Amino acid sequence: MYQCLRCGGIFNKRREVVEHLLVGHKHKDRLTLDFYYIYFRVRGQ
């Protein structure tokens, strides 16, 4: 699982994380998404 460290949102899939960053945090450039993964941490599988 992934948790957004900016807003605390919990996500089950990496795709959901990408959608959350694009929609929830208004990131427009997919090429920079990897940088924003620092806002997420994996929580137990």
From Swiss-Prot:
It comes from the Viruses. GO terms for molecular function: zinc ion binding. InterPro entries: Znf_C2H2_type. A zinc finger (C2H2-type) spans 2-25. The keyword Zinc-finger applies. PROSITE patterns: ZINC_FINGER_C2H2_1, ZINC_FINGER_C2H2_2. Keywords: Metal-binding, Zinc, Zinc-finger. This is Uncharacterized protein A-45. It comes from Sulfolobus spindle-shape virus 1 (SSV1).
